[in-house]
């Protein structure tokens, strides 16, 4: 299968070499790799140039944006800029972060998944992060049928059906919900162990939690599902304040009448899907 990779990169000189090296070693080679140099002021650009010489399918796109960390919107905006440079001749498209190391056979196995399971729209492995001893251990705070936003592969038909990625926090949740809305499945493979070099949530703060609550509003979760989802995250993180911050973000978005990310019909489907999952867990 033919596939293309888009890698948003903002000041990634520490990790980018490892990420691009893992792409270069893939047993199934991509047809193109676009690294979006998003307003970097470190050695990110020179690293991309170095790899472009080694492997001509690796291309650089430089854009100018804010230096602020904007969870969700900044990375998706960079991805969308890269998407504009792509040819249309791919079977699946990959959104990859600049701080992950993929196993050499990663995309060979992703291609097998898409070939063998025509209904699969999104596929990926699991993230492993270093603990205090330096050992890589699985860190997957979401459900096992969720693919982390750092290494997502989308079947072309699914990507087009859901209208690409939403430029907002929560994009890597709404994409899977919309994929299911359009009749596609999510597939995770436990054998695909991805090394994530930057611990999850390291750059997140109170502002990010407010945006998370806003995302739940814009996905049309409704208050009760937002409350349950926020409480679950707060419990897993051991941070009660994150529950309050999420709810504050939700009601701020509601009072400001922020535009929704999904249609009324999509929202109805999403709520039904969420309630089904919640009830399923309660009955276990």
Give each language-model segment a name:
Residues 148-163:
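Conserved nucleotide-sugar donor-binding
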Residues 30-39, 62-63:
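Short beta-strand/loop segment that forms part of the nucleotide-sugar
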Residues 89-101:
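Short beta-strand-to-loop acidic/aromatic patch adjacent to the donor-nucleotide binding site
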Residues 21-30:
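Short, acidic, metal-binding catalytic loop of nucleotide-sugar glycosyltransferases
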Residues 37-46, 100:
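A conserved acidic beta->alpha catalytic loop
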Residues 101-137:
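Conserved donor NDP-sugar-binding/catalytic core segment of glycosyltransferases
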Residues 76-92:
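Active-site nucleotide-sugar/metal-binding loop of Leloir-type enzymes
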Residues 208-284:
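Non-catalytic, C-terminal membrane-associated alpha-helical segments of glycosyltransferases
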């Amino acid at each position: 299968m033919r596939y293309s990779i888009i890698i948003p990169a903002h000041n990634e000189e520490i990790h980018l070499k490892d990420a691009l090296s893992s792409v270069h070693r893939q047993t199934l080679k991509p047809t193109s790799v676009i690294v979006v140099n998003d307003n970097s002021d470190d050695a990110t650009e020179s690293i991309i140039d170095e790899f472009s010489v080694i492997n001509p399918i690796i291309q650089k796109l430089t854009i100018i944006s804010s230096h602020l960390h904007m969870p969700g919107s900044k990375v998706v905006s960079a991805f969308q800029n890269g998407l504009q440079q792509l040819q249309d001749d791919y079977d699946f498209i990959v959104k990859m972060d600049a701080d992950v190391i993929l196993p050499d056979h990663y995309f060979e196995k992703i291609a097998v998944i898409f070939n063998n399971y025509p209904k699969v729209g999104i596929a990926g492995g699991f993230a492993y992060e270093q603990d205090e001893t330096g050992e890589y251990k699985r860190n997957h705070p979401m459900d096992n049928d969720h693919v982390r936003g750092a290494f997502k592969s989308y079947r072309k038909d699914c990507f087009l059906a859901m209208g690409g990625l939403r430029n907002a926090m929560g994009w890597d949740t709404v994409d899977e919900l919309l994929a299911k809305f359009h009749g596609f499945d999510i597939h995770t493979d436990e054998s695909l162990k991805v090394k994530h070099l930057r611990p999850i949530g390291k750059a997140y703060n109170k502002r990010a939690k407010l945006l998370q609550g806003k995302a739940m509003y814009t996905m049309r979760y409704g208050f009760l599902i937002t409350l349950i989802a926020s409480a679950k995250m707060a419990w897993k993180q051991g941070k009660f304040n994150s529950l309050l911050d999420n709810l504050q973000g939700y009601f701020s978005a509601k009072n400001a009448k922020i535009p929704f990310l999904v249609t009324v019909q999509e929202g109805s489907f999403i709520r039904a899907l969420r309630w089904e999952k919640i009830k399923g867990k309660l009955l276990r």
